[in-house]
A protein has these predicted regions:
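N-terminal binding-site loop/beta-alpha segment at the start of enzyme catalytic domains
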Residues: 1-82, 148
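Short, well-ordered coil/turn segments that N-cap beta-strands
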Residues: 9-14, 45-47, 78-82, 119-123, ...
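Conserved beta-strand positions
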Residues: 16-18, 51, 86, 124-127, ...
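Active-site mouth loops of central-metabolism enzymes
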Residues: 20-32, 92-104, 128, 133-134
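A short acidic, helix-capping loop that chelates divalent metal ions and anchors anionic groups
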Residues: 22-25, 55-58, 91-97, 191-196
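Short, acidic/polar
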Residues: 28-41, 100-117, 165-170
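Active-site groove signature of glycoside hydrolases
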Residues: 114-135
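Beta/alpha (TIM)-barrel catalytic core signal, keyed to glycine-rich beta->alpha loops juxtaposed to Asp/Glu
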Residues: 130, 134-330
C-alpha cells in the first residue's frame, strides 16, 4: 500500500475507518467480522486506523465499542506498528445539546481511549467537535497539555471551520509541527461538486477556502465520508442516467440535492474509468481525493474484507493512467 510521509510520520495512503466495528457486540460473529476486515487491511500493508471514543456508544453495548474492538485485535494479533487516530469531546448520545469540548472531558475520554486500545500513547488524538463559544486558545492549551504528558503523539481537529483552524495554527506559532497533526472534516468528490452543502449534526465540510489554507500551510486532511457513502454507485442502483444535454435523468434516493451538472460530469468520467480499470466508482472517488496535490488521506469503511482490494487497486492509479490526466482534479 502506498504511504504518505508528512511531518515526520509515515502513514498509509488509505486510512481504514472503524466507526461501526463492535457496535453489534464485542464477541462472536460481529467481532470475527471486524477482525477479518482488520486482518485483510493489515495484510495489504495498511497501518492507519481511524476510531473515536464515541464510536459504538449507539450500539448494543452503549460503550466505546470501536476502540475496544481495535484494542482486542491489537492484543490478540500482537500488533505494535499500527498508527491509530482517535477522537475525544463528542457529545453523548443521550445529551445531544450538551457540549463536551472542555479539558475535563478530553482527559476523561483520553484515559478511557488509552485503556480500551491498550496503548500508552495514542499517536493522533483529535477533538471530535468544536464549541465556538470557547476561546480557541483554551482548547489548544489542553491539547498541548495532552501531548506534553506523552499520552498522545499529536493533536488535531475534526469538524472545525477555517477561522478556528487558522486561529489555532497562529496561536501555536513555531510549535505547530510539533503539536498539530491535521484536520478531519467531511469531504468527497460528490460533496465538493454539490455546491452549497451544510452537513447535519454539527459536522463541518472541507470548503474550498479551507482546502486552500491547508495546502498553503501543509496541513494533513483526513476526510471522513470520503466516498459519500457510495453516492455514485447508488445512482446506478437508482437507475439514474445522463441525458443528451449532459444532465442527470432520474432521481437519487440519497442526497438528491447533489445532482448538479458538475456531478453529472463526474458520473460520466467515473463510469468510463470503471469500464477501463474495473475499479468501482466508489473506490475511484476515494482515489480522487488521494490524488490531490496536497496531503490528503481519505478515510474509508468497508463491510466486507474483499472491498479493500478495490480501494487498493484504485489508489495505485496515477494521474496519467486511464485518462486521469484529463480529469481536472485540482
Amino acid at each position: 500500500m502506498k504511504t504518505v510521509l508528512h511531518n515526520g510520520r509515515t502513514l498509509s495512503g488509505l486510512c481504514l475507518g472503524t466507526a461501526s466495528m463492535g457496535s453489534e457486540g464485542l464477541s462472536g460473529a460481529p467481532l470475527q467480522k471486524a477482525f477479518a476486515i482488520l486482518d485483510t487491511y493489515y495484510e495489504m500493508g495498511g497501518r492507519f486506523l481511524d476510531t473515536a471514543n464515541v464510536y459504538g456508544r449507539w450500539g448494543v453495548d452503549h460503550t466505546n465499542a470501536s476502540e475496544k474492538c481495535i484494542g482486542l485485535w491489537l492484543s490478540d494479533r500482537g500488533i505494535t506498528d499500527m498508527t491509530i487516530t482517535s477522537k475525544c469531546c463528542h457529545y453523548l448520545p443521550e445529551a445531544h445539546d450538551t457540549s463536551r469540548v472542555d479539558r475535563d472531558s478530553a482527559l476523561a475520554d483520553l484515559a478511557e481511549s488509552r485503556r480500551s486500545l491498550g496503548m500508552e500513547q495514542i499517536p493522533i488524538y483529535l477533538l471530535h467537535r468544536d464549541n465556538r463559544e470557547r476561546d480557541i486558545r483554551y482548547i489548544v492549551d489542553f491539547c498541548v497539555e495532552m501531548v506534553d504528558s506523552g499520552k498522545i503523539g499529536a493533536f488535531g481537529f475534526s469538524n472545525y471551520r477555517l477561522d478556528r483552524v487558522q486561529a489555532a495554527i497562529d496561536y501555536l506559532g513555531a510549535d505547530r509541527k510539533r503539536y498539530f497533526a491535521g484536520l478531519s472534516n467531511e469531504w468527497s468528490l460528490a460533496m465538493e461538486s454539490a455546491g452549497a452543502y451544510d452537513p447535519p449534526d454539527g459536522m463541518e465540510p472541507v470548503t474550498k477556502p479551507l482546502a486552500r489554507y491547508c495546502a498553503e500551510e501543509d496541513i494533513l486532511i483526513l476526510p471522513f465520508s470520503a466516498v459519500a457513502h457510495g453516492w455514485f454507485d447508488k445512482l446506478i442502483r437508482d437507475g439514474v442516467t445522463i441525458g443528451a444535454d449532459g444532465r442527470f435523468v432520474g432521481s437519487a434516493s440519497y442526497r438528491p440535492g447533489w445532482m448538479t451538472a458538475e456531478n453529472a460530469r463526474n458520473y460520466r468520467i467515473l463510469q468510463a474509468l470503471h469500464k477501463e480499470t474495473g475499479c468501482s466508482m466508489t473506490a475511484l472517488s476515494a482515489a480522487y481525493l488521494a490524488g490531490k496535490r496536497q496531503p490528503v488521506i481519505p478515510i474509508v469503511s468497508v463491510s466486507r474484507p474483499e472491498q479493500l482490494a478495490e480501494y487498493a487497486a484504485a489508489m495505485e492509479l496515477k494521474r496519467t493512467d486511464v485518462g486521469l490526466g484529463t480529469w481536472q482534479i485540482d
